[in-house]
Amino acid sequence: MSHNAPLVLMILDGWGYNENDRYNAIAKANTPQWDEWWQTCPHILLKASGLPVGLPDEQMGNSEVGHMHIGAGRVIQQDFTRINEAINNGKFAKNAVFHEVIDQLKKTEKSLHIMGLLSPGGVHSHEQHLFALLALCNQKKFRSVHLHLFLDGRDTPPQSALDSLKCLNEELAKHPVATINSICGRYYAMDRDKRWERVEPVYNLLTQGKSERQFPDAETAIHFYYKNKISDEFVPPTLIGKEHSIQDGDAVLFFNFRADRARQLTSTFLDPSFKGFERKTLPKLSYFVSMTQYDKNLLTTTAFPPVPLNNTLGEVLSSHGLSQLRIAETEKYAHVTFFFNGGCESVFTNEERIMVPSPQVATYDLQPEMSAHELTKTLIAAINSQDYHVIICNYANADMVGHTGNFEATVQAIECLDQCMQQVWQALKNNGGKLLITADHGNAEEMFSEATNQAHTAHTSEPVPFLYVGGGWHFTHSEGSLIDIAPSLLALLGITPPPEMTGRILLEKNHAHP
């Protein structure tokens, strides 16, 4: 390949901007490189939540939505918003997939097992979507419904499941069609890193009704776990009431709308070459319905199929004959590839990908640096190779350690990132390269909630930084949003953004003084 002075787009996952220093792990951390850049390099703040990223107003941003908007350069109506609208305008209750499944189950006198994250978080799911499904079952007078609920505590306060259960019980009083048959923390049910030892007990509970503990109702179970210092996210797979496992002829409906943490559990039912663990039983399902498409290789019946996107940043770079590298550790690999390409599985011409394995630890506060040092080494080697025109990389630390709620560990994570950024810039400088730094959403800048008096483990709605290092250019606007990143990056490369990109170019070349 030719010698290229690379342009690196560095996405610091979960690195938001907050004027308030209190509970702010980024402000508390010792970050000499970041501080120097913030004082001397052009930078602005970008909106990364709510309407500017296709979410409902005031809804916090998240990694999937953030990466899609950075890559697309336009506002994309998110699945969350799309499903909310379908509920409000009546299309949800008319969805042909839901009707077909319920009609078939009524005919065969089989059961519907609805599973998913019971949460008002709006990141992977929303409990209102479950409530809309219950209303539909009630409308169709279908009452053989079993609920298998995953608990959040990550995009919500660590102990908030009882609030959601209260809302669910109110809905069940109105629409008495279902029973709660199991609960389980998302740590087990929604793993995305091939930690099959977490998923196996969930599968055994769903298919055989097996769990270490059994409780008469979900509230009793949760009180027991809280007493034993186990918060929502980490509640082990637990049978509730009478055993109603998934049987031949039954249907499963997974109501999560976000794909990355739904794929593994789905694959235990649908992947013909599954090797994660030995399945004692494999029910022959009449349907496996997913709210959205989780993976084109997982043949679910999809209630809300994907809307294709053309001319995302990766496609534009490829069509201009430029080489690009996507690099991240396991936790965020899907984000810089699948989501960055607009939810598209295909790899563009001259697009290469490197995944650095994430460390195998129970929670990332135990290893705040995660795989950042290995990622940095690999990234520097790629810069020095001069094989790539553009490198898009993600550092997961601020988000993944921020999610643990451990303030000191998150400070360590930020300090590790600062060292990594300094090393990456040295390599870029030596190769005549340029650096754009941003984030997909906030997290580490707000680590405690005075409102709930609990650790703030969720994302925030704060803006994120957009910083340019490399000289010769300046920002023309005082603020923007994530959709402005792709057009601005193309401007640095001298490429006119395609008409599909409605984001603005925020960077302009400095005029030479006469």
From Swiss-Prot:
Q: Could you tell me which SUPFAM superfamilies the record lists for this protein? A: 2,3-Bisphosphoglycerate-independent phosphoglycerate mutase, substrate-binding domain, Alkaline phosphatase-like
Residues binding Mn(2+) 2, per UniProt: D13, S63, D440, H441
Free-text cofactor note: Binds 2 manganese ions per subunit.
How is this protein annotated for GO cellular component?
Answer: cytosol
User: Which amino acids does the record list as binding substrate?
Assistant: H124, R154, D155, R186, R192, R258, A259, D260, R261, K332
Chain positions recorded as Mn(2+) 1 binding sites: D399, H403, H459
Q: What class of enzyme is it?
A: isomerase
Q: Which residues form a coiled coil?
A: none
Pathway annotation: Carbohydrate degradation; glycolysis; pyruvate from D-glyceraldehyde 3-phosphate: step 3/5
Active-site residues, as the UniProt record annotates them: S63
Q: What is its EC number?
A: 5.4.2.12
- Under the GO molecular function aspect, what terms does this record hold? manganese ion binding; phosphoglycerate mutase activity
Please list the GO biological process terms of this entry: glucose catabolic process; glycolytic process
List the cofactors: Mn(2+)
Catalytic reaction equation(s): (2R)-2-phosphoglycerate = (2R)-3-phosphoglycerate
InterPro entries, per the entry: Alkaline_phosphatase_core_sf, BPG-indep_PGM_N, Metalloenzyme, PGAM_B_sf, Pgm_bpd_ind
Its keywords, alphabetically, are: Glycolysis, Isomerase, Manganese, Metal-binding
Record's family?
A: Belongs to the BPG-independent phosphoglycerate mutase family.
Q: How does it assemble?
A: Monomer.
- Role summary: Catalyzes the interconversion of 2-phosphoglycerate and 3-phosphoglycerate.
Name of the featured protein: 2,3-bisphosphoglycerate-independent phosphoglycerate mutase
Source organism per entry reads Legionella pneumophila subsp. pneumophila (strain Philadelphia 1 / ATCC 33152 / DSM 7513)
